[in-house]
From Swiss-Prot:
Belongs to the universal ribosomal protein uL18 family. GO terms for biological process: translation. SUPFAM superfamilies: Translational machinery components. InterPro entries: Ribosomal_uL18_bac-type, Ribosomal_uL18_bac/euk. This is Large ribosomal subunit protein uL18. Part of the 50S ribosomal subunit; part of the 5S rRNA/L5/L18/L25 subcomplex. Contacts the 5S and 23S rRNAs. GO terms for cellular component: cytosolic large ribosomal subunit. The gene is rplR. Gene3D superfamilies: 3.30.420.100. The keyword Transport does not apply. Pfam families: Ribosomal_L18p. This is one of the proteins that bind and probably mediate the attachment of the 5S RNA into the large ribosomal subunit, where it forms part of the central protuberance.
Length: 121
């Protein structure tokens, strides 16, 4: 079992456990150059809010600072944006789904920024 398969197995188990809780899920996906965050409905079929480093406003803000979005500063910005969008959609608390990625670096920065912006998990 290679690294990718192990990550996907961990992600699958996490999603099964979150589905049993019947709460909204904040899912994070990370690539070398970008980071994505989505809030799914409790049933898991609808995306209620999303934010990523591919959005025009985010790219414009990151162009002033550094790089495209593969860094902690970009992850912090996405964490704040997803929390704002989730609260606007009426979601106060979520279950955090790190998609098998380690809670470290960009994933941790996104989670902490979302918490600071008022999202509870």
């Amino acid at each position: 079992m290679d690294k990718t398969q192990s990550r996907l197995r961990r992600a699958r188990q996490t999603r099964i456990k979150i589905a049993e809780l019947q709460v909204a899920r904040l899912a994070v996906h990370r690539t070398n150059t970008h980071i994505y965050a989505q809030v799914f409905s409790p049933c898991g079929t609808k995306v209620l809010a999303s934010a990523s480093t591919l959005e025009a406003e985010v790219r414009a803000e990151l162009a002033d600072k550094s790089g495209k979005g593969g860094n902690v500063a970009a992850a912090t910005l996405i964490g704040k944006r997803i929390a704002e969008k989730a609260k606007a959609a009426g979601i106060e608390s979520v279950a955090f789904d790190r998609s098998g990625f380690r809670y470290h670096g960009r994933v941790k920065a996104l989670a902490e920024a979302a918490r600071e912006a008022g999202l509870k998990f």
